[in-house]
Amino acid sequence: MSEKLDLVIWNRAFSLKVLFDCFDDEEVLDSQRTALKYFKEADISASLDQVKQFCLEQNGKEIGTTIDNIFKYVVPYSVYIPRKQKESTAALLCHYRFDIENDLALIFENGNLVKICNPDYIL
């Protein structure tokens, strides 16, 4: 099941597809709706420095020492809400210039960024 979410991320407006991890015959779980609510309320802009740091640590040779425009390297395209009962988990999925095959996931729990990783971690 999916829906659209209009969101401003790092001072740029996006219309993102929200994907809920559901079985074909299943409705979206209350825990997934709660996770989306926390994600919408999260201060995603606060993650910018962490994302820049991640990019520099992973690909500093290609980037240099600073990042002026994060969108040269990272572009959000979707929000994924897994089937978890205990944590309110949401992943902001992003295209990543240096790993176009796998992309990048910013994992939020209860509205807080907890991990930046390969999307396989959450999918």
Regions found by a protein language model. Name each.
Residues 1-66:
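Long, contiguous N-terminal structural blocks used for assembly/anchoring
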Residues 64-74:
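Extended, compositionally biased
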Residues 1-17, 73-123:
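Acidic, proline/glycine-rich low-complexity IDRs
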